[in-house]
Amino acid sequence: MIQKETNLVVADNSGAKKVRCIHVFGGTGRRYASLGDQIMVTVKAAVPGGVVKKKEVTKAVVVRCAKEKRRKDGSYIRFDENAVVLLNAQGEPRGTRIFGPVARELRDKKYMKIVSLAPEVL
């Protein structure tokens, strides 16, 4: 479960390393985001010379979440960290590579570009 003020790791090569959630999209008063949900983030740490700079505000999609999520078949999926992929205005990833596994829920939410770039889909 991701909420406002949650610190997250960036799982792409856009230049950002750490971000903080400042808004959860999906209706007035929505409190938590899970796998495949869009959030608004601010960049807290970035590499020099990257596409994204510190203090920049951008959209992101959650690709790994530490809180377990129940699937339709009754199984649960859980990761060791909370991670996001940064998105541009069109909803496409800003980076050209994805690091680490991503959840299968992204395929259901139509993030095919992220799924195709990911080294592993769980």
From Swiss-Prot:
One of its GO terms (cellular component) is cytosolic large ribosomal subunit. Pfam families: Ribosomal_L14. InterPro entries: Ribosomal_uL14, Ribosomal_uL14_bac-type, Ribosomal_uL14_CS, Ribosomal_uL14_sf. Disulfide bonds: none annotated. GO terms for molecular function: large ribosomal subunit rRNA binding; structural constituent of ribosome. Keywords: Ribonucleoprotein, Ribosomal protein, RNA-binding, rRNA-binding. It comes from the Bacteria. One of its GO terms (biological process) is translation. PROSITE patterns: RIBOSOMAL_L14. The keyword Coiled coil does not apply. Part of the 50S ribosomal subunit. Forms a cluster with proteins L3 and L19. In the 70S ribosome, L14 and L19 interact and together make contacts with the 16S rRNA in bridges B5 and B8. Binds to 23S rRNA. Forms part of two intersubunit bridges in the 70S ribosome. Belongs to the universal ribosomal protein uL14 family. This is Large ribosomal subunit protein uL14. It comes from Chlorobium phaeobacteroides (strain BS1). The gene is rplN.
